[in-house]
Amino acid sequence: VIDRPLELRGQAGAIITGTGTGSVITVTAPDVRIEGLEITGSGTDLPAMDSAILVQQAAPRTIVRGNRLMNNLFGVYLHGAADSRVENNIIDGRQDLRLAEAGNGVSIWNAPGAAIIGNTISHGRDGIYVKISHHNRFENNTFSKLRFAIHYMYTNDSRIAGNRSRGNHVGWAIMYSERLEVEDNVSDG
């Protein structure tokens, strides 16, 4: 648990391996930066939001940048953490679970101002799943081998631009959302 503002920065080859239960890293403080790590080994409990990195409501302005999040249930879960950024990460989910049991690359719940930029996300349920969160930006991400590349639910006043979806069941699922800018995205198979 990261419970105070800090930077957790890995040197080349640094790996954090979880125990296979719970989240590997949980952030409960504002202004945390996690960068340059490989993180693996979360649990598989969907209701508990087991993630490589779980960012709680008390942790606004968290930055997750340049990491490799491999074989976790959820890659990054922004659970109420406003104005957080997830950028330039490689997120490769678990391949040993049925689709209904899999988590998302990035999940966002009630985290206004989230910026999800330049990530490569594969395997799992949805690349980015967002619910009840406004004023977000999802830009220049690449998605493959997922159910939905981007899945919007009850989320308004946001931007989806420059994303690429290849080999997913559906590219963009935009549901019950208003005032979105959706431009220059490509979905191929």
Predicted regions and their residues:
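Short "repeat-start/strand-capping" segments in structured domains, especially the N-termini
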Residues: 4-6, 30-31, 60, 81-84, ...
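Short coil-to-beta transitions that initiate beta-strands within beta-rich domains
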Residues: 56-57, 66, 99-111, 145, ...
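Extracellular beta-rich repeat passengers
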Residues: 56-58, 66, 78, 88, ...
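A generic beta-sheet turn/junction motif
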Residues: 20, 29, 57-59, 71, ...
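Short glycine/acidic-rich loop motifs that flank beta-strands on beta-rich extracellular proteins
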Residues: 12, 18-24, 43-50, 72-80, ...
